[in-house]
Each structure stands twice: as C-alpha cells, then as structure tokens.
C-alpha cells in the first residue's frame, strides 16, 4: 500500500484539543488549542506522524478554531518538517474568519510559490472542492472528515 492509499479517520490528539485525518493524498488538521506552546507544536507534529505513518502528502488543510501558530512556531514546524525528511505540501488551505490570517496565507503563497488559498468558515464546501483538484481524495470525503473533526472537538460545522 502506498502512502496515498492510506485513510486515517479523524483522530483526536493533544488530549482532545486537536484532530488529524488523512484522506489518501490530503491531510486535515483541526485544532482548538487556546494557547500554543513550542512543546504542544512538537507533540502535535509527532502525534500526526505516528498516526499518519510518516508519509508526506501533496495537499493539506488546516483549521485553527483557537489560537494559530505564531511566527516562531511556524518556523519551528518548518524546521521540524525538514529535519524529519518530509516534503512540504504543494497545495495548502486554511479556514479562518480572520481577514488578517487569510491575507497572511496569501502573502505566504506569493513568497514561497506555494499553491495556497484561505477560505472563510462559511465557504468550507468551496475549500473542499479546491483542495482536492487533481487529487485522489474527494471533496465529499474531505467535508465528511472536517465535519467529524468538528464534532470530535465539540464544535459544529455550519
């Protein structure tokens, strides 16, 4: 079985404050962490690696319902990815109602030449369609995993 054939149903991490799912060639992370620390970031990355089997996938969805990583934690995450031999996702998306966060992802995509697009929470179905273009995963599967992740975290996806 190749890594892209793997499906990991939404699984809780960080004592129920975060979820991870892998749908073939798309990963999904949803977190409701009120305050990230470097230790939590590393625990999250290691937990995702253990559950996901250490496979780099070409597309990734991130949803931060609580606080998102700060600049130092994004750097820590990037360095951890490189040090552990993973390839960064070629297509990334984030759901946030913050214009600042969405604008930051746009700027990031320009600087890194990464295919990246941010969506408002109300546009989560459009995000599912966008992230799976030319992928094995389907928009229906990504949306279902997103909905289950929200439920596991005690949230409702509207």
Predicted segments with their positions:
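Amphipathic, Lys/Arg-enriched alpha-helical "gate/interface" segment within cytosolic domains
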Residues: 1-158
């Amino acid at each position: 079985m190749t890594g892209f054939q793997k499906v990991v149903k939404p699984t809780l991490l960080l004592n129920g404050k975060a979820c991870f799912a892998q749908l073939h060639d798309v990963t999904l992370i949803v977190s409701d962490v009120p305050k990230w620390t470097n230790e939590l970031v590393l625990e999250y990355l290691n937990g995702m690696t253990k559950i996901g089997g250490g496979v780099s996938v070409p597309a990734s969805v991130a949803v931060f319902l609580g606080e998102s990583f700060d600049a130092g934690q994004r750097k820590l995450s990037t360095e951890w990815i490189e040090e552990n031999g993973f390839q960064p996702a070629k297509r990334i998306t984030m759901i946030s109602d913050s214009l600042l966060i969405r604008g930051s992802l746009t700027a990031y995509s320009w600087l890194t030449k990464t295919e990246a697009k941010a969506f408002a929470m109300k546009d989560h179905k459009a995000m599912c369609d966008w992230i799976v273009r030319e992928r094995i995963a389907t928009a229906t599967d990504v949306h279902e995993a997103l909905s289950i992740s929200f439920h596991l975290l005690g949230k409702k996806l509207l």
